Amino acid sequence: MSTWLLPENIADVLPSEARKIEELRRRLLDRFRSYGYEMVMPPLLEYLESLLTSGGADLRLRTFKLVDQLSGRTLGLRADITPQVARIDAHLLNRQGVTRLCYAGHVMHTRPRGLHATREQIQIGAEIYGHAGLEADLEIQQLMLDALHLAGLSRIRLDLCHAGVLAALLARDPQAAERGESLYDALSGKDVPLLNELTDDLGADTRAALCALPHLYGDASVLDEARARLPVLPEITRALDDLAQLAAQAKGVEVAIDLADLRGYAYHSGAMFTAYIDGVPNAIARGGRYDHVGQAYGRARPATGFSLDLRELARISPIEARGTAILAPWAQDDALGAAVAALRDAGEVVIQALPGHDHVLDEFACDRSLVERNGAWVVEPR
Protein backbone atom coordinates (compact mmCIF):
# COMPACT_ATOMS: atom_id res chain seq x y z
CA MET A 1 0.00 0.00 0.00
CA SER A 2 1.35 3.44 -0.93
CA THR A 3 2.29 5.52 2.10
CA TRP A 4 0.89 8.69 0.53
CA LEU A 5 -2.67 7.41 0.20
CA LEU A 6 -5.36 8.84 2.46
CA PRO A 7 -8.60 7.17 3.62
CA GLU A 8 -11.63 7.43 1.36
CA ASN A 9 -13.35 10.82 1.43
CA ILE A 10 -10.43 12.36 3.31
CA ALA A 11 -8.23 14.87 1.49
CA ASP A 12 -5.43 17.34 2.07
CA VAL A 13 -6.29 21.01 1.77
CA LEU A 14 -3.78 22.54 -0.65
CA PRO A 15 -2.64 26.19 -0.56
CA SER A 16 -5.17 27.66 -2.99
CA GLU A 17 -8.12 26.02 -1.21
CA ALA A 18 -6.68 26.70 2.25
CA ARG A 19 -6.25 30.38 1.40
CA LYS A 20 -9.87 30.65 0.31
CA ILE A 21 -11.13 28.76 3.37
CA GLU A 22 -9.13 31.03 5.68
CA GLU A 23 -10.37 34.16 3.91
CA LEU A 24 -13.97 33.02 4.36
CA ARG A 25 -13.38 31.98 7.97
CA ARG A 26 -12.04 35.43 8.81
CA ARG A 27 -14.86 37.22 7.00
CA LEU A 28 -17.54 35.19 8.75
CA LEU A 29 -16.02 35.35 12.23
CA ASP A 30 -15.56 39.11 11.87
CA ARG A 31 -19.22 39.43 10.88
CA PHE A 32 -20.28 37.27 13.84
CA ARG A 33 -18.26 39.53 16.14
CA SER A 34 -19.97 42.60 14.67
CA TYR A 35 -23.26 41.13 15.95
CA GLY A 36 -21.77 40.57 19.43
CA TYR A 37 -20.94 36.85 19.24
CA GLU A 38 -18.11 35.52 21.41
CA MET A 39 -15.90 32.76 20.05
CA VAL A 40 -15.43 29.43 21.84
CA MET A 41 -13.13 26.52 20.97
CA PRO A 42 -14.43 23.15 22.20
CA PRO A 43 -12.08 20.14 22.04
CA LEU A 44 -12.05 17.80 19.06
CA LEU A 45 -12.27 14.81 21.43
CA GLU A 46 -14.74 14.20 24.28
CA TYR A 47 -16.29 11.37 26.24
CA LEU A 48 -18.83 9.75 23.97
CA GLU A 49 -21.83 10.31 26.24
CA SER A 50 -21.15 14.07 26.25
CA LEU A 51 -21.13 14.24 22.46
CA LEU A 52 -24.29 12.18 21.97
CA THR A 53 -26.71 14.00 24.26
CA SER A 54 -28.76 15.12 21.25
CA GLY A 55 -29.02 14.36 17.56
CA GLY A 56 -30.40 10.84 17.87
CA ALA A 57 -29.25 7.72 16.07
CA ASP A 58 -27.89 9.66 13.09
CA LEU A 59 -25.31 11.50 15.21
CA ARG A 60 -24.28 8.27 16.93
CA LEU A 61 -23.67 6.57 13.57
CA ARG A 62 -21.65 9.53 12.28
CA THR A 63 -19.35 9.68 15.33
CA PHE A 64 -15.93 8.00 15.35
CA LYS A 65 -15.33 6.09 18.59
CA LEU A 66 -12.12 5.05 20.32
CA VAL A 67 -10.90 3.96 23.75
CA ASP A 68 -9.13 6.42 26.04
CA GLN A 69 -5.76 4.91 27.01
CA LEU A 70 -5.80 6.83 30.30
CA SER A 71 -9.28 6.09 31.65
CA GLY A 72 -10.48 3.14 29.58
CA ARG A 73 -13.66 5.06 28.74
CA THR A 74 -15.03 5.45 25.23
CA LEU A 75 -14.19 8.70 23.51
CA GLY A 76 -15.70 10.24 20.41
CA LEU A 77 -14.36 12.51 17.69
CA ARG A 78 -16.99 15.20 17.37
CA ALA A 79 -19.32 15.02 14.38
CA ASP A 80 -21.13 18.25 15.33
CA ILE A 81 -19.92 21.20 17.41
CA THR A 82 -23.40 22.41 18.40
CA PRO A 83 -23.83 20.05 21.42
CA GLN A 84 -20.41 21.10 22.68
CA VAL A 85 -21.33 24.78 22.56
CA ALA A 86 -24.56 23.97 24.42
CA ARG A 87 -22.47 22.24 27.10
CA ILE A 88 -20.28 25.32 27.44
CA ASP A 89 -23.31 27.58 27.81
CA ALA A 90 -25.12 25.31 30.26
CA HIS A 91 -22.27 24.08 32.42
CA LEU A 92 -19.27 26.39 32.14
CA LEU A 93 -20.53 29.90 31.44
CA ASN A 94 -23.75 29.48 33.45
CA ARG A 95 -25.01 32.94 32.50
CA GLN A 96 -28.57 34.00 33.23
CA GLY A 97 -29.19 36.35 30.32
CA VAL A 98 -28.73 36.12 26.58
CA THR A 99 -25.45 34.56 25.44
CA ARG A 100 -24.18 34.76 21.86
CA LEU A 101 -21.48 32.25 20.93
CA CYS A 102 -19.75 31.33 17.68
CA TYR A 103 -17.19 28.74 16.65
CA ALA A 104 -15.14 27.33 13.78
CA GLY A 105 -13.48 23.92 13.84
CA HIS A 106 -13.05 20.51 12.28
CA VAL A 107 -15.64 17.74 12.62
CA MET A 108 -15.24 14.11 11.55
CA HIS A 109 -17.88 11.81 10.06
CA THR A 110 -17.69 8.04 9.82
CA ARG A 111 -19.49 8.16 6.47
CA PRO A 112 -19.75 10.94 3.88
CA ARG A 113 -23.10 12.64 3.50
CA GLY A 114 -22.87 12.56 -0.29
CA LEU A 115 -21.05 10.79 -3.10
CA HIS A 116 -18.22 13.31 -3.24
CA ALA A 117 -18.56 14.78 0.26
CA THR A 118 -15.63 14.92 2.64
CA ARG A 119 -15.68 13.12 5.97
CA GLU A 120 -13.68 15.96 7.52
CA GLN A 121 -15.67 19.16 7.45
CA ILE A 122 -14.76 22.57 8.82
CA GLN A 123 -17.90 23.60 10.66
CA ILE A 124 -18.57 27.26 11.40
CA GLY A 125 -21.66 28.58 13.11
CA ALA A 126 -23.33 30.84 15.65
CA GLU A 127 -25.77 30.26 18.50
CA ILE A 128 -28.01 32.39 20.73
CA TYR A 129 -28.94 31.07 24.18
CA GLY A 130 -31.41 32.46 26.68
CA HIS A 131 -34.16 34.02 24.55
CA ALA A 132 -37.28 32.05 23.61
CA GLY A 133 -38.81 34.75 21.42
CA LEU A 134 -38.82 34.87 17.65
CA GLU A 135 -36.41 37.80 17.75
CA ALA A 136 -33.51 35.37 18.28
CA ASP A 137 -34.57 33.24 15.29
CA LEU A 138 -34.85 36.36 13.14
CA GLU A 139 -31.32 37.42 14.12
CA ILE A 140 -29.84 33.99 13.42
CA GLN A 141 -31.59 33.77 10.06
CA GLN A 142 -30.30 37.23 9.12
CA LEU A 143 -26.78 36.31 10.24
CA MET A 144 -26.86 33.12 8.16
CA LEU A 145 -27.93 35.04 5.06
CA ASP A 146 -25.29 37.71 5.76
CA ALA A 147 -22.64 34.98 5.90
CA LEU A 148 -23.69 33.60 2.53
CA HIS A 149 -23.71 37.07 0.96
CA LEU A 150 -20.24 37.75 2.39
CA ALA A 151 -19.08 34.62 0.57
CA GLY A 152 -20.28 36.17 -2.67
CA LEU A 153 -23.25 33.85 -3.14
CA SER A 154 -26.35 35.01 -4.97
CA ARG A 155 -29.65 33.44 -6.04
CA ILE A 156 -30.11 31.98 -2.56
CA ARG A 157 -33.24 30.01 -1.75
CA LEU A 158 -34.35 29.88 1.87
CA ASP A 159 -36.54 26.92 2.85
CA LEU A 160 -38.58 27.33 6.03
CA CYS A 161 -40.33 24.74 8.17
CA HIS A 162 -41.43 24.44 11.80
CA ALA A 163 -41.12 21.43 14.10
CA GLY A 164 -44.08 22.69 16.13
CA VAL A 165 -46.63 21.77 13.46
CA LEU A 166 -46.01 18.01 13.55
CA ALA A 167 -45.45 18.09 17.31
CA ALA A 168 -48.88 19.68 17.83
CA LEU A 169 -50.60 17.12 15.60
CA LEU A 170 -48.98 14.20 17.42
CA ALA A 171 -49.70 15.68 20.86
CA ARG A 172 -53.46 15.73 20.21
CA ASP A 173 -53.61 12.09 19.05
CA PRO A 174 -51.88 9.43 21.22
CA GLN A 175 -52.30 6.80 18.49
CA ALA A 176 -50.48 9.02 16.00
CA ALA A 177 -47.80 9.80 18.58
CA GLU A 178 -46.99 6.09 18.88
CA ARG A 179 -46.11 6.14 15.17
CA GLY A 180 -44.23 9.41 15.38
CA GLU A 181 -40.93 8.11 14.01
CA SER A 182 -42.58 6.32 11.08
CA LEU A 183 -44.70 9.37 10.29
CA TYR A 184 -41.61 11.55 10.42
CA ASP A 185 -39.81 9.27 7.94
CA ALA A 186 -42.79 9.25 5.58
CA LEU A 187 -43.16 13.03 5.69
CA SER A 188 -39.45 13.71 5.26
CA GLY A 189 -39.34 11.42 2.24
CA LYS A 190 -42.61 12.80 0.82
CA ASP A 191 -43.80 9.18 0.72
CA VAL A 192 -47.52 9.84 0.28
CA PRO A 193 -48.57 6.15 -0.15
CA LEU A 194 -46.80 5.21 3.09
CA LEU A 195 -48.30 8.23 4.83
CA ASN A 196 -51.79 7.18 3.71
CA GLU A 197 -51.15 3.70 5.07
CA LEU A 198 -49.84 4.95 8.42
CA THR A 199 -52.81 7.28 8.93
CA ASP A 200 -55.53 4.97 7.63
CA ASP A 201 -57.00 4.19 11.07
CA LEU A 202 -56.39 7.56 12.72
CA GLY A 203 -59.06 10.11 13.48
CA ALA A 204 -60.36 11.96 10.45
CA ASP A 205 -59.01 15.36 11.53
CA THR A 206 -55.54 14.01 12.34
CA ARG A 207 -55.40 11.99 9.12
CA ALA A 208 -56.46 14.95 6.99
CA ALA A 209 -53.89 17.24 8.62
CA LEU A 210 -50.99 14.80 8.35
CA CYS A 211 -51.80 13.94 4.74
CA ALA A 212 -51.99 17.64 3.90
CA LEU A 213 -48.43 18.40 5.05
CA PRO A 214 -46.58 17.04 1.95
CA HIS A 215 -48.73 19.28 -0.23
CA LEU A 216 -48.17 22.44 1.81
CA TYR A 217 -45.13 23.78 0.03
CA GLY A 218 -44.48 26.82 -2.12
CA ASP A 219 -43.98 30.53 -1.54
CA ALA A 220 -45.17 32.37 1.56
CA SER A 221 -48.77 32.32 0.32
CA VAL A 222 -48.92 28.61 1.18
CA LEU A 223 -49.25 29.67 4.82
CA ASP A 224 -52.78 30.88 4.08
CA GLU A 225 -53.61 27.44 2.69
CA ALA A 226 -52.08 25.85 5.78
CA ARG A 227 -54.30 27.92 8.06
CA ALA A 228 -57.33 26.66 6.14
CA ARG A 229 -56.34 22.98 6.06
CA LEU A 230 -54.73 22.43 9.47
CA PRO A 231 -56.54 22.31 12.84
CA VAL A 232 -56.88 25.58 14.70
CA LEU A 233 -54.48 24.83 17.55
CA PRO A 234 -52.50 27.50 19.44
CA GLU A 235 -49.20 25.75 18.69
CA ILE A 236 -49.91 25.53 14.96
CA THR A 237 -51.15 29.11 14.77
CA ARG A 238 -48.00 30.30 16.52
CA ALA A 239 -45.78 28.21 14.23
CA LEU A 240 -47.42 29.60 11.09
CA ASP A 241 -47.15 33.15 12.44
CA ASP A 242 -43.44 32.59 13.12
CA LEU A 243 -42.88 31.32 9.58
CA ALA A 244 -44.70 34.33 8.15
CA GLN A 245 -42.40 36.72 10.02
CA LEU A 246 -39.27 34.79 9.06
CA ALA A 247 -40.34 34.81 5.41
CA ALA A 248 -41.08 38.54 5.51
CA GLN A 249 -37.66 39.35 6.96
CA ALA A 250 -35.69 37.40 4.34
CA LYS A 251 -35.05 40.19 1.85
CA GLY A 252 -33.31 39.58 -1.45
CA VAL A 253 -33.67 35.79 -1.42
CA GLU A 254 -36.24 33.35 -2.72
CA VAL A 255 -38.34 32.00 0.15
CA ALA A 256 -40.03 28.61 0.09
CA ILE A 257 -42.26 27.09 2.77
CA ASP A 258 -42.28 23.30 3.10
CA LEU A 259 -44.19 21.98 6.09
CA ALA A 260 -43.03 18.41 5.44
CA ASP A 261 -39.30 19.21 5.25
CA LEU A 262 -38.67 17.81 8.71
CA ARG A 263 -35.00 16.83 8.52
CA GLY A 264 -33.67 17.32 12.02
CA TYR A 265 -37.16 17.20 13.55
CA ALA A 266 -35.96 15.06 16.48
CA TYR A 267 -33.33 17.71 17.20
CA HIS A 268 -35.28 20.93 16.61
CA SER A 269 -38.14 22.38 18.63
CA GLY A 270 -39.25 25.35 16.55
CA ALA A 271 -38.50 27.14 13.29
CA MET A 272 -36.04 25.48 10.92
CA PHE A 273 -34.33 27.20 8.00
CA THR A 274 -32.18 25.78 5.22
CA ALA A 275 -30.28 27.65 2.51
CA TYR A 276 -29.69 26.40 -1.04
CA ILE A 277 -28.11 27.98 -4.10
CA ASP A 278 -28.64 27.28 -7.78
CA GLY A 279 -26.57 24.43 -9.17
CA VAL A 280 -25.81 22.82 -5.79
CA PRO A 281 -28.09 19.91 -4.87
CA ASN A 282 -27.39 19.84 -1.14
CA ALA A 283 -28.06 22.50 1.48
CA ILE A 284 -25.24 24.98 2.00
CA ALA A 285 -26.37 26.08 5.50
CA ARG A 286 -28.88 24.86 8.08
CA GLY A 287 -30.28 26.39 11.24
CA GLY A 288 -33.16 26.45 13.64
CA ARG A 289 -34.39 26.37 17.21
CA TYR A 290 -33.48 23.57 19.65
CA ASP A 291 -34.56 24.61 23.13
CA HIS A 292 -33.94 21.23 24.78
CA VAL A 293 -30.31 20.73 23.74
CA GLY A 294 -28.83 21.86 27.09
CA GLN A 295 -31.11 19.66 29.19
CA ALA A 296 -28.60 16.79 29.27
CA TYR A 297 -26.08 19.14 30.86
CA GLY A 298 -28.49 20.07 33.64
CA ARG A 299 -29.66 23.41 32.29
CA ALA A 300 -32.12 23.59 29.41
CA ARG A 301 -32.12 27.05 27.86
CA PRO A 302 -33.85 28.48 24.81
CA ALA A 303 -31.43 28.15 21.91
CA THR A 304 -31.29 28.82 18.20
CA GLY A 305 -28.41 28.79 15.74
CA PHE A 306 -27.03 27.81 12.36
CA SER A 307 -23.94 26.17 10.88
CA LEU A 308 -22.30 25.41 7.55
CA ASP A 309 -19.24 23.65 6.13
CA LEU A 310 -16.44 26.05 5.22
CA ARG A 311 -14.87 23.61 2.76
CA GLU A 312 -18.09 23.35 0.79
CA LEU A 313 -18.61 27.10 1.01
CA ALA A 314 -15.10 27.69 -0.36
CA ARG A 315 -15.76 25.28 -3.21
CA ILE A 316 -18.77 27.19 -4.48
CA SER A 317 -17.85 30.74 -3.47
CA PRO A 318 -16.85 32.99 -6.38
CA ILE A 319 -14.58 35.22 -4.29
CA GLU A 320 -10.96 35.49 -5.39
CA ALA A 321 -8.67 34.87 -2.44
CA ARG A 322 -5.34 35.06 -4.23
CA GLY A 323 -3.51 37.79 -2.39
CA THR A 324 -1.28 40.53 -3.74
CA ALA A 325 2.30 40.80 -2.56
CA ILE A 326 5.51 42.76 -2.91
CA LEU A 327 8.47 40.96 -4.50
CA ALA A 328 11.79 41.76 -2.86
CA PRO A 329 15.29 40.50 -3.65
CA TRP A 330 17.27 38.34 -1.29
CA ALA A 331 20.40 40.08 -0.04
CA GLN A 332 22.43 40.48 3.12
CA ASP A 333 21.62 44.17 3.35
CA ASP A 334 20.60 45.86 6.59
CA ALA A 335 18.67 48.60 4.81
CA LEU A 336 16.77 46.02 2.75
CA GLY A 337 15.99 44.00 5.87
CA ALA A 338 14.68 47.10 7.63
CA ALA A 339 12.51 48.03 4.62
CA VAL A 340 11.05 44.51 4.42
CA ALA A 341 10.34 44.45 8.17
CA ALA A 342 8.61 47.85 8.02
CA LEU A 343 6.38 46.73 5.16
CA ARG A 344 5.43 43.52 6.96
CA ASP A 345 4.69 45.47 10.14
CA ALA A 346 2.34 47.62 8.05
CA GLY A 347 0.41 44.51 6.99
CA GLU A 348 1.97 43.96 3.57
CA VAL A 349 2.95 40.54 2.24
CA VAL A 350 6.60 40.68 1.19
CA ILE A 351 8.13 37.69 -0.58
CA GLN A 352 11.89 37.58 -0.86
CA ALA A 353 12.83 35.66 -3.99
CA LEU A 354 15.46 33.07 -3.18
CA PRO A 355 18.39 32.84 -5.61
CA GLY A 356 17.39 31.05 -8.82
CA HIS A 357 13.64 31.21 -8.08
CA ASP A 358 12.72 34.75 -9.03
CA HIS A 359 9.77 33.76 -11.22
CA VAL A 360 8.32 30.74 -9.34
CA LEU A 361 5.49 32.45 -7.47
CA ASP A 362 2.23 30.53 -7.75
CA GLU A 363 0.28 31.49 -4.66
CA PHE A 364 0.55 35.28 -4.70
CA ALA A 365 0.18 37.90 -7.38
CA CYS A 366 3.26 40.08 -6.94
CA ASP A 367 2.01 43.36 -8.35
CA ARG A 368 4.81 45.47 -6.82
CA SER A 369 8.56 45.21 -6.35
CA LEU A 370 10.91 46.48 -3.69
CA VAL A 371 13.80 48.08 -5.55
CA GLU A 372 16.80 50.21 -4.63
CA ARG A 373 16.74 53.75 -5.95
CA ASN A 374 19.45 56.26 -5.07
CA GLY A 375 20.48 54.28 -2.00
CA ALA A 376 16.93 53.83 -0.65
CA TRP A 377 14.55 50.88 -0.92
CA VAL A 378 11.20 51.87 -2.43
CA VAL A 379 8.08 50.04 -3.63
CA GLU A 380 7.25 50.32 -7.32
CA PRO A 381 4.53 48.77 -9.52
CA ARG A 382 5.72 45.77 -11.53
Curated annotation (Swiss-Prot):
- For this entry, list what GO says about its biological process: histidyl-tRNA aminoacylation; L-histidine biosynthetic process
Range of residues in the leader sequence: none
For this protein, the record's SUPFAM superfamilies field holds: Class II aaRS and biotin synthetases
Keyword Secreted included in the entry's annotation: no
**Pathway it works in:** Amino-acid biosynthesis; L-histidine biosynthesis; L-histidine from 5-phospho-alpha-D-ribose 1-diphosphate: step 1/9
Q: Which CDD domains match?
A: HisRS-like_core (cd00773)
**Where is the protein found, in the record's own terms?**
Cytoplasm
Coiled-coil regions listed: none
| MF (Gene Ontology) | histidine-tRNA ligase activity
Q: What is its main location?
A: cytoplasm
GO annotation, cellular component aspect = cytoplasm
InterPro entries in the record: aa-tRNA-synth_II/BPL/LPL (IPR045864), HisRS-like_core (IPR041715), HisRS/HisZ (IPR004516), HisZ (IPR004517)
Kindly indicate whether the keyword Cytoplasm belongs to this entry. yes
- Enumerate the NCBIfam families for this protein: hisZ_biosyn_reg (TIGR00443), PRK12292.1-1 (NF008935), PRK12421.1 (NF009086)
Q: Other remarks?
A: This function is generally fulfilled by the C-terminal part of HisG, which is missing in some bacteria such as this one.
Quote the subunit structure annotation.
Heteromultimer composed of HisG and HisZ subunits.
Q: Which family does it belong to?
A: Belongs to the class-II aminoacyl-tRNA synthetase family. HisZ subfamily.
What is the role of this chain?
Answer: Required for the first step of histidine biosynthesis. May allow the feedback regulation of ATP phosphoribosyltransferase activity by histidine.
Return the PANTHER family for the record.
Answer: HISTIDINE--TRNA LIGASE, MITOCHONDRIAL-RELATED, HISTIDYL-TRNA SYNTHETASE
**Which HAMAP family does the UniProt entry name for this protein?**
HisZ
UniProt-recorded name of the protein: ATP phosphoribosyltransferase regulatory subunit
For this protein's source organism, the top of the classification is:
Bacteria, Pseudomonadati, Pseudomonadota, Betaproteobacteria, Burkholderiales
